[in-house]
């Protein structure tokens, strides 16, 4: 279910499907890097201004699904305009800052992004650009990332399937929103 908070900036309504905390797992595979399964936690939040705040933490998983070590951390800010053009600024822990542009699909909650600019610190590894696809599918958030370096052409390197995380605060908010005249047996929901 996509919930649109009453204090969400009006320009961000098309991105409301991203809001919340997400967790799941995926696959990482790129030449010169360790191929592995990874766990991921993502949050998209807002404070009433015209952008979403984004945070992602990934970690390598062992064969039993246990956390082994951090893989990648990134954070950033996402905006969308009236023409459904999306811009994102993201910073990664490996010393890369990216500006992404793309668009929100016309009839489905899907975002295609492409890097417009990449800045790297001296500590960053080779990286020259990428693409990302985010989609809201059957109440889950799925994404795939592609990247390129001077040595490797653009290719997929990470993808994940994330589920919405329900917090105690969510349950409390939903409970407060229930109608006062709800029947004791709850059957009315199914009639």
UniProtKB/Swiss-Prot annotation:
Protein family membership: Belongs to the nitrobindin family.
SUPFAM superfamilies for this protein: Lipocalins (SSF50814)
Name this polypeptide is given: Ferric nitrobindin-like protein
Lineage summary: Bacteria, Bacillati, Actinomycetota, Actinomycetes, Kitasatosporales
Cross-referenced InterPro entries: Calycin (IPR012674), Nb(III)_bact/plant (IPR022939), Nitrobindin (IPR045165), THAP4-like_heme-bd (IPR014878)
Top-rank lineage group of the source organism: Bacteria
Motif (GXWXGXG): 20-26
Cross-referenced Pfam families: THAP4_heme-bd
């Amino acid at each position: 279910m996509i919930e649109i908070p009453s204090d969400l900036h009006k320009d961000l309504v098309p991105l409301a499907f991203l809001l919340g905390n997400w967790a799941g797992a995926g696959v990482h595979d790129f030449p010169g890097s360790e191929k592995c399964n990874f766990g991921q936690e993502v949050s998209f939040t807002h404070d009433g201004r015209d952008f979403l705040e984004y945070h992602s933490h990934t970690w390598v998983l062992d064969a039993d699904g246990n956390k082994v070590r951090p893989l990648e951390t990134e954070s950033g800010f996402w905006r969308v305009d009236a023409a459904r053009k999306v811009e994102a600024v993201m910073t990664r822990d490996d010393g890369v800052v990216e500006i992404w542009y793309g668009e929100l699909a016309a009839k489905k909650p899907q975002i295609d992004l492409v890097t417009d600019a990449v800045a790297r610190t001296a500590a960053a590894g080779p990286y020259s650009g990428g693409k990302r696809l985010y989609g809201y599918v059957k109440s889950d958030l799925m994404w795939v990332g592609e990247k390129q370096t001077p040595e490797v052409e653009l290719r997929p390197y990470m993808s994940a399937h994330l589920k919405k995380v329900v917090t105690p605060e969510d349950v409390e908010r939903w409970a407060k929103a229930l109608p006062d005249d709800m029947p004791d047996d709850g059957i009315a929901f199914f009639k």
